[in-house]
Curated annotation (Swiss-Prot):
Stored PROSITE patterns: G_PROTEIN_RECEP_F3_1, G_PROTEIN_RECEP_F3_2, G_PROTEIN_RECEP_F3_3, G_PROTEIN_RECEP_F3_4
Membrane topology: Multi-pass membrane protein
First and last residue of the signal peptide: 1-32
Protein's name in the database: Metabotropic glutamate receptor 4
Subcellular location: Cell membrane
TM ranges: 587-607, 625-645, 654-671, 700-720, 752-772, 787-807, 827-847
Side of membrane Extracellular, spans: 33-586, 646-653, 721-751, 808-826
An annotated Gene Ontology molecular function: G protein-coupled receptor activity
Quaternary state and interactors: Interacts with PICK1.
SUPFAM superfamilies from the UniProt entry: Periplasmic binding protein-like I
Glycosylation: residue positions: N98, N301
Length: 912
């Protein structure tokens, strides 16, 4: 080879040459092994033309090991099928007469990297080696046995293995025919131009599976794929076909790692359960992964939940479902149309250790198949394993069922044989044996003959290839069924461009012939609207019409009018109930009780005061302001009845007037009293003259002025916003429309209520301030301290009222809670004033009349001086026990005051 083309050829193969130089069989010692002796990792059969073979005799190893357990069906059955086909061709006088086919068969160990390493054996003979620098000990050149030239390869099984091997074989133009690889990627003739297969591409299989899913009325499925070309390409093809055909949505696409960790399959099942409606699982996985998925489903107690649909890697194999029959029941599988080869059954059943020495793995198969050991040294003490006798027979002493791909292995070998036969006929016409034009065989020419073969396969099916090297799509459809305690695969249909499915033959766990559901979304219930999922036309979310919405049509929710709420099933609207506080409501019991008792007590006090109007205690309490205060207390109690009465124009008008008026009257009277006391004592500190406006008439005038301000505000309110009742649908518009209520109430908002009571609160706070300022006045001189205690207690009541009243604004019982809170607070305020200011006086009047006598009169100067000195002395009260200093001082101050001849304004003690 010379010129640019030659250099390009060598540069393209330079990396491979470097790899081969590291490979163990490249050294002369290994190449010098005598022909016909089996290698440790391969079967070598002599012939005029050598075919390569790649089979997964062992599974993938773990913990750094290349190979694992023996695979009896996928490995030994398929390998023996190739040997069986070679024997038939070599014994056929009409096919390749006088030409013997040999073989070099390797174990891929179900791993693409190991298969790559093994397949380097096939290209050794195609690379010439320069041995000029290699000399033996005698100085002569070494004798190197040239490796056999492999003209074509049968295999591999897994798509990922075939892809890896095809990348090397195409460099050396070695045709390859696979018997099991179905990944759509291998149909790319620009990348895998020397690859052909006797099984159809997964593109056909994916279409068939989509047709099955649609026939079963499933529209929501998950996919599960083994990592690698076969699984990932198969799922990708299925998804693509489902999109093209429509009507099928993919819930999840889960990938099984090439080297799964402990617990990985349990996580996969857990993830699949996240979309529990997707009960149908489309599986493109190797049989080891399939089995571990089924085991994980059983551990998760999901037997009967999932409905499996397996690709041809599952097919009708027993290994994935062995002792997992309950979990696998109902599984629908697909397999390229095949027929059991009876001749192979007879051939394989007759294999023994004596007549099958060419298969170097047959002894291992024998031990595994019959559960015995060939060597006594391998038997362990106490073990139940027996020694092999060589009298065991396959199918008699062990179970036997032909593996599903045996037919395709035989067809692949025959396709290679027919291509070589046609090539020999054209290149060596009339010649016996090989002619120079076929020695060596040109791979490019052989590929053309392979693509043009057309013959009846071992099962009678036509064997042909299209321009991409793919076989036509013909599938049988199976279902794994259990009956009477036994399980088996039943043919339920076929697919050849179109689906032919016998649904009446199908059996489902728990439901018999009734089709199980694996649908994206259940029909929406009344009151729910459909919200389609973007990119998934068959899927939708059922979203309930929330809040005050009702269902207009399948896709729309609309809000009810403001005075209506949705019905129970949210298909229409209905009026919102209107509520008010009833007289017989439990919420009205306490306010009415307090009001009735309060009014009775107030009237009792008024009657007592009127009857004993001229007694010293009544006079000393300031009769005029006392009656005003009692009137305010009465109105506070009476307001309760207005608050509970049904709101109308009259009731709402009276509420505006009297709700704040009663409190204003009460606190105006108390404020006038405390202000009078404060001014008297403050004036006394500066002079002996009496302050202004302390007469009863002045006090009444001040009180009515304060009250008139409240009335003036109410009048302005009536003018600006006339009173009326309203039905408030917003106030009790709860989040749950079932509890929504229209509240019949007066047009008094929370803000209006604050303004209405605000003036009364201002009077109350001011009165409290004066009560604090006069707290130091001796209690024997006035009623400032009882007023102070009254105001302190009242403040506490209203401080408790505020959070309760405004904190329940969002409650469904807001009307009841706020009305009850307001009326009880008003009644308690009135009760505090009535109880602390008047009940002690009534008690003395009725039960201790001896105390209802006039007191000594004191001058203003004496009273003020005593109060002032008392305050100062209180700070030093610890110098005299029991307050003796205070009493003594007061008495010392009294004598000069009585003896003086000056005229002072005098007041009775209680009058102050």
């Amino acid at each position: 080879m010379s010129g640019k083309g030659g250099w390009a050829w060598w540069w393209a193969r330079l990396p491979l040459c470097l790899l081969l130089s590291l490979y163990g069989s490249w050294v002369p010692s290994s190449l010098g092994k005598p022909k016909g002796h089996p290698h440790m990792n391969s079967i070598r059969i002599d012939g005029d033309i050598t075919l390569g073979g790649l089979f997964p005799v062992h599974g993938r190893g773990s913990e750094g090991k290349a190979c694992g357990e023996l695979k009896k069906e996928k490995g030994i059955h398929r390998l023996e099928a190739m040997l069986f086909a070679l024997d038939r061709i070599n014994n056929d006088p009409d096919l390749l007469p006088n030409i013997t086919l040999g073989a070099r068969i390797l174990d891929t160990c179900s791993r693409d990297t190991h298969a790559l390493e093994q397949s380097l054996t096939f290209v050794q003979a195609l690379i010439e080696k320069d041995g000029t620098e290699v000399r033996c000990g005698s100085g002569g050149p070494p004798i190197i046995t040239k490796p056999e030239r492999v003209v074509g390869v049968i295999g591999a099984s897994g798509s990922s293995v075939s892809i890896m091997v095809a990348n090397i074989l195409r460099l050396f133009k070695i045709p390859q025919i696979s018997y099991a690889s179905t990944a759509p990627d291998l149909s790319d003739n620009s990348r895998y131009d020397f690859f052909s297969r006797v099984v159809p591409s997964d593109t056909y299989q994916a279409q068939a599976m989509v047709d099955i899913v649609r026939a079963l009325k499933w529209n929501y499925v998950s996919t599960l794929a083994s990592e690698g070309s076969y699984g990932e390409s198969g799922v990708e093809a299925f998804i693509q076909k489902s999109r093209e055909n429509g009507g099928v949505c993919i819930a999840q696409s889960v990938k099984i790692p090439r080297e799964p960790k402990t617990g990985e399959f349990d996580k996969i099942i857990k993830r699949l359960l996240e979309t529990s409606n997707a009960r149908a699982i489309i599986i493109f996985a190797n049989e080891d992964d399939i089995r571990r998925v089924l085991e994980a489903a059983r551990r998760a107690n999901q037997t009967g939940h999932f409905f499996w649909m397996g690709s041809d890697s599952w097919g009708s194999k027993s290994a994935p479902v062995l002792r997992l029959e309950e979990v696998a029941e109902g599984a629908v599988t697909i397999l390229p149309k095949r027929t059991s080869v009876r001749g192979f059954d007879r051939y394989f059943s007759s294999r023994t250790l004596d007549n099958n020495r060419r298969n170097i793995w047959f002894a291992e198969f024998w031990e595994d198949n019959f559960h015995c050991k060939l060597s006594r040294h391998a038997l362990k003490k106490g073990s139940h394993i027996k020694k092999c006798t060589n009298r065991e027979r396959i199918g008699q002493d062990s179970a036997y069922e032909q593996e599903g791909k045996v037919q395709f292995v035989i067809d692949a070998v025959y396709a290679m044989g027919h291509a070589l036969h046609a090539m020999h006929r054209d290149l060596c016409p009339g010649r016996v044996g090989l002619c120079p034009r076929m020695d060596p065989v040109d791979g490019t020419q052989l590929l053309k003959y392979i693509r043009n073969v057309n013959f009846s396969g071992i099962a009678g099916n036509p064997v042909t290839f299209n321009e991409n090297g793919d076989a036509p799509g013909r599938y049988d459809i199976y279902q794994y069924q259990r009956r009477n305690g036994s399980a088996e695969y039943k043919v339920i249909g076929s697919w050849t461009d179109h689906l032919h499915l016998r649904i009446e033959r199908m059996q489902w766990p728990g439901s018999g012939q009734q089709l199980p559901r694996s649908i994206c979304s259940l029909p929406c219930q009344p009151g729910e609207r459909k919200k389609t999922v973007k990119g998934m036309a068959c899927c939708w979310h059922c979203e309930p019409c929330t809040g005050y919405q009702y269902q207009v049509d399948r896709y729309t929710c609309k809000t009810c009018p403001y005075d209506m709420r949705p019905t129970e099933n949210r298909t229409s609207c209905q009026p919102i109930p209107i509520v008010k506080l009833e007289w017989d409501s439990p919420w009205a019991v306490l306010p009415l009780f307090l009001a009735v008792v309060g009014i009775a007590a107030t009237l009792f006090v008024v009657v007592t005061f009127v009857r004993y109007n001229d007694t010293p205690i009544v006079k000393a309490s300031g009769r005029e302001l006392s009656y005003v205060l009692l009137a305010g207390i009465f109105l506070c109690y009476a307001t309760t009845f207005l608050m509970i009465a049904e709101p109308d124009l009259g009731t709402c008008s009276l509420r505006r007037i009297f709700l704040g008026l009663g409190m204003s009257i009460s606190y105006a009277a108390l404020l006038t009293k405390t202000n009078r006391i404060y001014r008297i004592f403050e004036q006394g500190k500066r002079s002996v003259s009496a302050p202004r406006f302390i007469s009863p008439a002045s006090q009444l005038a001040i009180t009515f002025v304060l009250i008139s301000l409240q009335l003036l505000c109410i009048c302005v309110w009536f003018v600006v916003d006339p009173s009326h009742s309203v039905v408030d649908f917003q106030d009790q518009r709860t989040l749950d429309p079932r509890f929504a209520r229209g509240v019949l109430k007066c047009d008094i908002s929370d803000l209006s209520l604050i303004c209405l009571l605000g003036y009364s609160m201002l009077l109350m706070v001011t009165c409290t301030v004066y009560a604090i300022k006069t707290r130091g006045v001796p209690e024997t001189f006035n009623e400032a301290k009882p007023i102070g205690f009254t105001m302190y207690t009242t403040c506490i009541v209203w401080l408790a009222f505020i959070p309760i009243f405004f904190g329940t604004s969002q409650s469904a019982d807001k009307l009841y809670i706020q009305t009850t809170t307001l009326t009880v607070s008003v009644s308690l305020s009135a009760s505090v004033s009535l109880g602390m200011l008047y009940m002690p006086k009534v008690y003395i009047i009725l039960f201790h009349p001896e105390q209802n006598v006039p007191k000594r009169k004191r001058s203003l100067k004496a009273v003020v001086t005593a109060a002032t000195m008392s305050n100062k002395f209180t700070q030093k009260g610890n110098f005299r026990p029991n307050g003796e200093a205070k009493s003594e001082l007061c008495e010392n101050l009294e004598a000069p005051a009585l003896a003086t001849k000056q005229t002072y304004v005098t007041y009775t003690n209680h009058a102050i």
